Amino acid sequence: MQKKLFLLDAMALIYRAYYGLIRNPRLTSAGRNTNAQFGFTSTLIDLIKKENPTHMAVAFDTHAPTERHTTFVDYKANREDAPEDLLDAIPDIKRIITGFNIPCIELDGYEADDVIGTLAWQAAAAGYTVYMVTPDKDYGQLVKENVFIYKPPYMGSKEEILGPKEVCEKWQIKDVHQVIDILGLMGDAVDNIPGIPGVGEKTAMKLLAQYDSIENVLANADKIGGKMGEKIKAGADSAILSKQLATIITDVPVTFHEEDFCIRDHNKDALSENWNSKPWVNVSWATRLVPVAKLLPQARYNWTSLATPPLRLLSLHRKIILSKR
């Protein structure tokens, strides 16, 4: 059997679910908006039933600052506060994930992107085919022979699977490593990454087609000349900073132990207890699931927080250890 690991970017999928149903919200009898719970759970079940993963995990962001915030204080500073309904959904969603016996991983000082990137490359090196489940374009820098982006269906669209070929075609680049150069030049409004003012996506792709990297673009600013050459000179520091901010870390202190990520039979009692009290989902969804490793023993996971020495300029770093109970 092919070993397939699916790594879910929790917050990206939760936001997507919440706003994807915003015009037709899933409300409880008390008027509570449960778009996020409904949408995320639907995506999770569809993945398990349709894609037949052998291994799975869900990565969450934390509220702790990261090295990116230390490097650039305005990193993600343009984001509005999340709606209260969305924030209230997170504990529900974590309980659902736990009911499926799927590990949740979060690590202070790092974003979910970094955790997923690290685990994806480790698992690929161990012979797994890895799917990073996210709508975020940043993940394009991580794809390789056995590592793909998996964009779930959204508002009527079909799922989209992107490998190196698809990522390079999308950005008109020669190698996926150039994704961070694209983002460094054009910036990323979602994360408040500045890029070079006046350089958009088309210009960034044109510059990289000729010069291959941000460093070479900056080195040839005089040759480029004109107003664009002046913009490049003026924005040189911003470009280098932006490339650094856009780079996903792949040496996070987490380890892929395949036995901890196995798909196991769901905990029907736990799901029933949780879902019977929630009008936004039908417990029959759980009974229709046919887990890949149905004969494996069920597992429970404890979340243990450990204080560790300073890491990458951070004063505090908490590591979530998955341990069978």
Regions found by a protein language model. Give the residues of each.
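Non-catalytic, usually N-terminal nucleic-acid engagement modules in DNA/RNA processing proteins
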Residues: 1-57, 61, 67-72
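Short, compositionally biased "basic patch" segments
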Residues: 12, 62-67, 83-92
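Short acidic, Gly/Ser-rich segments with clustered Asp/Glu that frequently serve as metal-coordination loops
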Residues: 12-16, 138, 325
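Short, basic, glycine/proline-bearing loop/turn elements
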Residues: 24-33, 97-107, 297-303, 307-311
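Long, highly charged low-complexity segments
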Residues: 261, 266-325
